[in-house]
Every structure is written in structure tokens, then in C-alpha cells.
């Protein structure tokens, strides 16, 4: 089995790790950073920028720079959560044909799994560059409170990125794996995970290599992005009071506010006050306007007080579902960049009655846990058993619009449960199975995962036919449902891809497009490299012609000049092969010139090394050769 990488696909940042010599290693990207911004930008030239490159140009290209796409994954366009995002996003969120929330950039529509796949491709490439081999197998993490359609969409993103997703695991569970791998004692821990877009809390029991999740709860629409938005609104309101201009109407100014707000939030984790300076933020008839203000930690905490208060409910519910009190918890592990905020740490201490453990890196621990799970699946990590749970109850709609639960929340997965139902009317030829996920009593108040029909039921009075409905949740937390007429043995099943999910054909089409785009990227890179080498060759040749052109025949000189002209013409086009061919021709034509350069430098070296003794003269010649080598090394460097 090939190497398995662990990927933390985050709302704000992503991270990749792998097992090396029995230890998990976080891999730095091409820019030297151990985390990569989960951002994608579409440049005017058609080029796609991923990560730090995308983040750097976000201010000047806000409408075509996508971020926090994880908040849209597996969601319908008409949900309240998506409407909230539409109001604050500089990019366009649109309704897809399947009612999903998609994005539109430069006239092209993309699904959230497609955009997430671009981030995953960057993580895959980062791992491949480090390992020096092709990587196909991965473990990808998701928030514990992700529902079935969000998990399925994440798995689709992996497939589009060219990855074989061996397992989808919950972020808090991954963090617990990383924390508890070398712990020998039995303990009960709470993992408090507040990331860029989601909040999870999981209660686990650890002991003898067994990691058993007792309960999980959370909010998939509460995270750092919401804190940033509160800061943006505060800054914009203050500026409006002062200058009478609402910056929220200007997408470029809004992006600058977002960056400044995020920076201020980070700075206030270690200092009590920070300055926000944004010169030339906007202009009116009286001239340019500058934004200058101070933000204190106390003010930040007051404007985010509502969000901080919302962290308590899921923690209390998770404790209750686990049958534990706060005093039963031995350690509280902090995960996610937002847990660096002092007010968040204080809230955790208030809820659990103990100082949280800050011994793990909150940005990297989830990817490390995913890599460990990859090691378990590959057989490299022994004596580790992970028992995860399903975060939400699953059931079907029954007579009167009621949700009848078959699998309760916090059931250990994988699991299977069957129940026998019957028809609601006489001679009913078919039953429609409406699959739901959620905790509300009425079906309409829960999330629809899918619908399917079992037909061909023989005529019989109502209540007579025996229809067995079976729910099966796999280790990824993805649901399979079947219905069987026990009288006839007829069966119908569905693998839930959610009514708003991508079809198999759509996923395969996106895989092909991603592969084609990777090939385009390779061609673009080859063209850029060929142009750079050609530019350097022209520069070196023209420089040598100026200095040594009189040392060669006029006919040779003309050939070189013609070669330079031909290469310059090839550079006007975008055919890498033509440029390479013209470069080779110029190099062939330049041989005589290279000899003249060599002879000149050789002569200079020999003159400078005249000595009274024979041996010294030989040494001088050697020294001259070294000078020549260095000269040629310099030419090579220029060509690179």
C-alpha cells in the first residue's frame, strides 16, 4: 500500500501530514509555511492561484477570490446559513440546478467540492514534493457536526482532486488521536475545536490504545469568520459615524477591512491594544479618506460577546449526552486557531472548571491525527482502535409527518439498524421512503437526506405488508438505506448522496476537468520556463556579441544575430516547443562566439599567472582553468 497522507481541510487554512519512521510529520508547502490558506483566486489571465498566492491578491481581486467555501459545502442555497454568507461575501454565491449553493467566478459556475478539490490538489502536491513520490491515498478530516451530505461532498472533493479517500474522520477525534497516541493512562477528555468556520466539541474516553467517542455536538456555522465579521462591522460603523461613508458598499475596501480585522484579532491575543491604519481606504468629493483607529482587547470581547456565549450550549449538551459532568473531565484539549483568543480560553475554563491543555499546536494537531489514522489503516500504527460516533439521529418520515428515529445520535459507527413498517392505506402498491437526519420530532423540521420508492407491493389491507427498513452507516459516517418487502423479498436501496449532492456523472466530469487543468498548468509552467531560459540566452548572447563580436567572422556574427532575431520572434508567441527549437538553434550558432569568449578568458588567466618556477606556472594554468569554469558556471546560473 502506498503512503497515506492526512489532510485537515480547514475553512480558513489547510494542513497536510504524513507518518515518517513511526512519527507524524507536518509538511511545509512550497512557500515554506506549515499551513496553507484555503483560498482560490481566478486571475484575469485565466490562471488559478491557490493558497498564499490567492490571499496576496485578494484586495485587488475580491470578486474572483474565494474563501471559506467549506461553509457552503453540502448546503442548499435557500438555507438561512447560506443567506447569511451571501450578504457578506464579495464573490457571487448562486443557486445550482440541484438547489445547492455554488459560486460563480468570471462567468463560470463551480460547486463547493470543486473549489475544495483545488485546495486538496495543493496539499497533495505539497506532500508529493516532500516524499518524492506520487500520492493517491488520503484521510481527510471534517467537523464532527457535519451531516451526511457535507461528508459526502467532502469525499467528492477528494475524488475530484485525484485522491482515494480511505476515511473521513471527525476533526476533534483526529486531535484526540494526536494528543493521546503516547498516553498510557486512562482518561476522559473534551476536545474543544473552534476553527475558521465551524465549532465542535467531543467527549472521549482514552485508554489502552482505544479512543472511544462518547458524544459530540457543535455548530457548523460558528467560527473565526464570524468573529472577523463582527470586527469588520464595528470598524465600518465607526468609520461611517466619523466620515458618513459606509465602506461595506465597496468590495475592495471591504476586503481590506477583512484583512485588517483578522490581523487585529490575532494581535489582540497577545496585546491589550492594537492600531488599525488603512490609508486611502476610499474617497469622496473632498478627497481621499484614511481609516485610523484603535481597538482594545476589551472592545473586541464586548463586540464578540454573543458569539462567545454561543460556545456554551454545545459543550453542556455534549457532557449531558455522554452522561458526564464537567468535573469528570480530566483534560480539555484546544484545537483551532480561534482558541488562541484569551476570552475563548476563559470561556472554556468557566465551562469545564479547569485550565485547558495547550500542549498541542491548534493549527496542526488535526492533520497530525489524520496522518496517524492513515498509519492505522496502512498497518504502520499498531494497537490503536478508534470508535467514532454519528453526530445526528437518522430516521424516516412516518404517518402524520413524524420523524421515526432508527439510529440515535452519538451511536458508535459503523452501525446497522432495522425496523419493520407497514402501509398506511389499503392496497397501497408502493411506499415512499423519506430519509431524514436531525433531532426534531416533526419530519419537516429536520434535514432531508434523500427519497426513494419501494414499488410492486401486492394488494393487501393497510397494516398487512411488512416493509423492513435498514439503515447502515459506514466508518466514514456516510449513510446507506434499504427497504425490503418481507412478503415478496423485493428490495430497493439507496446510498445517500443527499438530494442536493453531486451525481456520480458530475463528480467524474469534475475529475476529468481537474486532470485537464493540471495538464494545462504543466504546459503553462513549461512555457514560462522556456521563455525565462530564452530571455537569459538572448541577454548573454547579446552581451558576448558586444564584447567579443570582433573576434569572429562576419558570417558567423550574422548567423548569431539571425538566431537572436528568430528567438525574439518565437518569444512573441506562446508555443514552448518553438521557443525551445529557436533556443537550440541560437546555441548552435553561438559556438564560435563561445570559443572566442573562452580563448579570451583563458589568455587573461595565463597572463595573470606567470611565475618564475615551472611548477608555479603549472599551478597558474590550473588557476586560469578555475577562472574559466567559474565564468561558465555564472552563465549557467543566468540561464536557470
From Swiss-Prot:
Residues 600-640 are annotated as: Disordered. Residues 628-640 have a biased composition (Acidic residues). GO terms for molecular function: ATP binding; ATP-dependent protein folding chaperone; unfolded protein binding. The modification Phosphothreonine is found at residue 198. Keywords: ATP-binding, Chaperone, Nucleotide-binding, Phosphoprotein, Stress response. Pfam families: HSP70. It comes from the Bacteria. Induction: By stress conditions e.g. heat shock. The keyword tRNA-binding does not apply. InterPro entries: ATPase_NBD, Chaperone_DnaK, Heat_shock_70_CS, HSP70_C_sf, HSP70_peptide-bd_sf, Hsp_70_fam. Belongs to the heat shock protein 70 family. Acts as a chaperone. This is Chaperone protein DnaK. It comes from Geobacter sp. (strain M21). The gene is dnaK.
